[in-house]
Amino acid sequence: MLRTESKKTNECIARKAFFFSLTAIVVALLLILPAFGADKKKDEETLRRANIVLQDMLNSKEISPEVLSKADCVLILPDVKKFGFGVGGMGGRGPLLCRRGQKFEGKWSAPAMYSVGGASIGLQAGGTSTDFVLLLMNEKVVNQVLNGKTKMGTDATAAAGPGATAASASDADILTYGRAKGVFAGVSLGGASVEPDNDANYRLYGKTLTGNDIVRGTDVKPSGDGQALVTMLDSKLTTHGK
């Protein structure tokens, strides 16, 4: 009799523990899913703004089709924030796309999200915002970026993009274009680190993918503004190839 009652008691405790655990999981999901959805909307907004930044720079002729055709990859960073006074910080993120094929001579890949951050030196009181487009000009710097964190100015040499020609485009690892308050200029991200934003890539594609998986793979299909970026860049390949 005592054994039967003890068994019933244990079963009751087990059921309560199960339902408590299940309730905790449901509550956690209810808290996480809205945040996940909100973050995904931010990712999609970043892609939308990246489309605008790249289109503006191409339309302005700041980035010539001839120089773009020499690039292995392009990293678009809309709205990079710099903050502080004297020595401050910077941060932003955006999509990286690369030419397909072993020699980076094919069409453009799906976009992989990357982040940029680090210290900045200057007299910006409060904060400033700059749009950047970075052209990665050789396989060495592409491999560095795809394989992990890359520090600008240390791991890769960067030069101002405006004024670069197809002949001089290969002199630097990275050509940098910047736009602050509508003014185009060749500006530096010296000291900033570039690395993959794995969380954003998971939200955009629904599975765990590295930056290398996305831009060097062939089975990753972008949608919406991600596909619009690919289409825009591919359209420049019709008349200007490597």
Functional labels for PLM-detected ranges:
Residues 1-19:
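N-terminal secretory signal peptides that target proteins for export/translocation
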Residues 1-3, 33, 110:
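Intrinsic-disorder/low-complexity coil detector
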Residues 6-7, 27, 36:
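Intrinsic disorder/low-complexity segments in short proteins, especially the signal peptide
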Residues 21-32:
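Bacterial N-terminal signal peptides
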Residues 32-38:
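Sec/Tat signal peptide C-region and signal peptidase I cleavage site
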Residues 38-242:
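Small-residue-enriched, tightly packed secondary-structure blocks
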